[in-house]
Amino acid sequence: IVRDDETLEPFRPHILSVVDVFSGMGVATLVSKSNSLSLTRLLWKAIDKFGKPDMIKGDNGKDYLSKDFQSLLDGLNITYDAAIAYAGEQKALVERRFGTLQHAGISKMHGHIGNNLAKREMIEQKTPKKDRRAKDEYGFAKKTNQKLLHTFSEACELLEAEVIKWNMSKVRRKKGVKTPLELWNS
């Protein structure tokens, strides 16, 4: 959970990510709302970093299958292969990246609500019941301790730092296996 930069209202942002299959290099962005415009921005960011792909394997959500996004892909001559619903193994690299990001530095951010419902409920239970029904200093309902929440722009910078760290890091990789950045540069 982060706070809006202007209104300071807490909200839950979305993480959008692209991962290069060969190297494992990734690009990710934090958006307030996942829609075709935010996907288009992410695609241009990925093209700027990796070049134009021949094919993208992705989600089957309405924003991914929208007319705007699909016409952009058609115009760029990029084939889109939508994964079957609820089949995360079909886009395993991206799902693994989300898991890594959720368990890494993002889990240390103020306002992190866990990576599953049980953890979220456990975190919310740490806040006294009377406080969960109360309002924060900005007048918004608080379910968790939201006093130290990052702003949206701060959270974007933290996410970008985690992506860079992942791309350059050998942490928890098998001995002799190159980092994504080393694979990309080879």
Label the model's feature ranges:
Residues 1-48, 52-60, 82-85:
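A short, conserved beta-strand element enriched in hydrophobic/aromatic residues
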Residues 43, 69-70:
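Distinct, well-ordered alpha-helical segments
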Residues 60, 70-185:
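Globin-like tetrapyrrole-binding proteins
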Residues 64-67:
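Extracytoplasmic/secreted cell-surface and envelope-processing proteins
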